[in-house]
């Protein structure tokens, strides 16, 4: 059996042949740990209830979507409680650095971008956590799951899906377990918050109500000041707001706010804080646009949510995404032949999520055109947005109702559910592995004396940065010292 699994591993990712044996033994150990964990029976019971609910779901059931969302919310919370993580990982340390070492003022820190991202509003959340909750990183885990639950509520409330089986597909997509890599790393809450922005925007942008206009205006303005994914909203407005049937003054307002948000996100740090080391990018995006890797990534990342986190299946993702894109193009072309330009107008107006998903894929393919982008869990949010839009479009195309085959849709639902929860480095496997690493570091510090502090720091540094050396070890040690002295965050003991 081990040889069979090893051969599969090598076939799927030949570049990591040396790691396959280690991965297989590690996965077996983690599986045994999961089965023997405290809340495993409760988790298994909830999962079984969800599976039974899907198997015996009828086409027309009242409140089935809300019930499914509630069960998934409980399942995700149980997984988080059973496999707790409360330590900063990788980018988190850079994002919280100034809260400990205080090299610059708080205002400068808020305006200082991280890599290519302006994360002003995410840093405000970090600051609140630091000042009122002792920098408790576990809060981010549960906040992410709450946001996902709220997204599902917003979706169910606004989309009147009369087919319960099809409605379940959208709920399962929203609750994809591939997002656990985002849930359990504090900085990745930016992806979930932007997901919340995008779904809220989708159901307010076409409204002329004052409350909707205010909310939509806020979302458009703050989204590029939150994270890179947030740029999809102002870019959508600047490109496609014409097609929305709202007052032209509202359209102009949205366009002004889009430009203002982008300019503030890009220019404010450079204008007022040019000493922060922010430099312009030397990337030649035109060359990338004409390179095959752009198109591999563009189509591949659209299907990210379906894929295991293995580079060897990235090309499969590209094929899936390309087929979906072709199907959309075919339906648009058919509607154009029947309705001329009006058919395209209707498509753009009614399929905001597809457009937003394509904008996401375009941005990611320009900035990170590689196979890892296609399969990496962090990009699953953009894929989920596109897939929700894609399946909504198929559902609403009346002449293609034959595509809503009950058994086929149930198979898709079960695949997304099980792959998201049980594939390696997804769902339960991801969270359990993080939990074990988390506890290994914590136990070292709990048993720590002044004579072994350096040993624990080295262990933590190698573990929390996956063996990478990009973050200065001296800054890491200084942060640990401050956290220990103040009994703060995960060193609060």
Please state what every model-predicted region is:
Residues 7-53, 64-117, 126, 130-167, ...:
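Intrinsically disordered, polar/acidic, low-complexity terminal segments
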Residues 50, 153-157, 199-207, 233-244, ...:
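Transmembrane alpha-helices and membrane-interface helical segments
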Residues 66-75, 167-173, 259-263, 340-368:
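Transmembrane alpha-helix segments characteristic
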Residues 82, 129, 175-184, 267-276, ...:
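Juxtamembrane "helix-exit" motif on the non-cytosolic side of transmembrane helices
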Residues 200-223, 250-256:
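Short hydrophobic alpha-helices at membrane interfaces in multi-pass membrane enzymes
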Residues 212-240:
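Membrane-interface alpha helices of multi-pass inner-membrane proteins
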Residues 232-263:
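Perimembrane helix-loop-helix junctions
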